């Protein structure tokens, strides 16, 4: 009978096994994001951009920056290495903060608002060129591959 052909059976779908780490992270952040927005809370996330698509991180940031979706002024505080987020289209200058280690290893925290920045400046380009500091000291990595003895 036709009904036998289309008989449905429950299928177990192990979410953590079958989904990407980015999808799992997104779903694990969904409730804290909704809770923060609904109740005007602070949400603090380390390595926010890790494992997630850049468009998704921008969408989440937009939720917090919008008066419509964030009428209770919830705050999203996060660390990131995604320089694409350094944009006047996403953040005001006072919303962007940098960290830099001093010579003793203590971390200094400072805002982009402390710098005189032209209205048409590219925050990302200026940051990557070292204009705002907070750039890691990489050094000459080619020495790691020099296997010849002198």
Report residues per predicted region:
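Conserved P-loop NTPase mechanochemical-coupling segment
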Residues: 7-18
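C-terminal lobe/lid and adjacent interdomain/linker elements of RecA-like ASCE P-loop ATPase modules
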Residues: 61-150
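Conserved D-loop-proximal element of ABC-family nucleotide-binding domains
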Residues: 53-54
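GG-anchored amphipathic helix commonly corresponding to the ABC/SMC/Rad50 NBD signature/C-loop
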Residues: 19-43, 59
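Short, small-residue-biased leader/transition segments that mark boundaries at the very start
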Residues: 1-6
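Short, conserved, surface-exposed binding loops centered on an aromatic residue
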Residues: 18, 34-37, 68-70, 88
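Walker B catalytic acidic pair
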Residues: 46-48
């Amino acid at each position: 009978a036709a009904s036998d052909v289309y008989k449905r059976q429950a299928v177990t779908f192990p979410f953590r096994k079958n989904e990407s780490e980015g999808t799992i992270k997104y779903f694990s952040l969904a409730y804290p994001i909704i809770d923060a927005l609904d109740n005007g809370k602070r949400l603090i996330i380390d390595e926010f951009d890790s494992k997630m698509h850049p468009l998704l991180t921008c969408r989440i940031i937009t939720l917090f920056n919008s008066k419509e979706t964030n009428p209770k002024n919830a705050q999203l505080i996060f660390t990131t290495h995604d320089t694409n987020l350094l944009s006047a289209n996403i953040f005001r200058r006072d919303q962007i903060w940098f960290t830099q280690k001093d010579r003793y290893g203590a971390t200094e925290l400072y805002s982009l608002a402390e710098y005189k920045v032209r209205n048409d400046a590219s925050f990302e380009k200026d940051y990557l060129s070292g204009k705002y500091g907070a750039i890691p000291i990489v050094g000459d990595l080619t020495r790691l591959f020099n296997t010849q003895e002198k």
